Amino acid sequence: GGYGCLHSALKYPSTFSKVGAFSAGDKADSVFVNDNSTKAKNRILLFGDKDIHNTDYCLTYLADKLIADNKKALAPDIYHACGSLDPWLDMNHIVRDYFLEHNDFYNYTYDELEGLGHEWKFWDIELQKFLDYAGLPVVK
């Protein structure tokens, strides 16, 4: 999803010059409760059972590394979008606020669509906007 897209672009910036990240909250900002649920088990399989801040699983950690290493030339252009009804909107706002604070380093654009959530209608609209942002043709 959106987290994975943004994570890949920040972890491998020499591979990705642009990224479209839709509903891209940082997994490090979600509260982890090991309640033996399927969700908790999947999280442990992916990230382990420890806090993932200050690790390569944390989006802001990866973004800070690019800044610290002065790799602005490699920093991907980021198009980030979320629907106003998305259940993870608050986590997206944390990511948005981070990149807006570092907009002198990152070419960052955020779009929030009113009245849409974590749904195909939102993604279809935003995918077309991202393709335009990236200078790629939109085929209809």
Residues covered by each model-derived region:
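Non-catalytic cap/lid and distal C-terminal segments of serine-dependent acyl enzymes
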Residues: 1-140
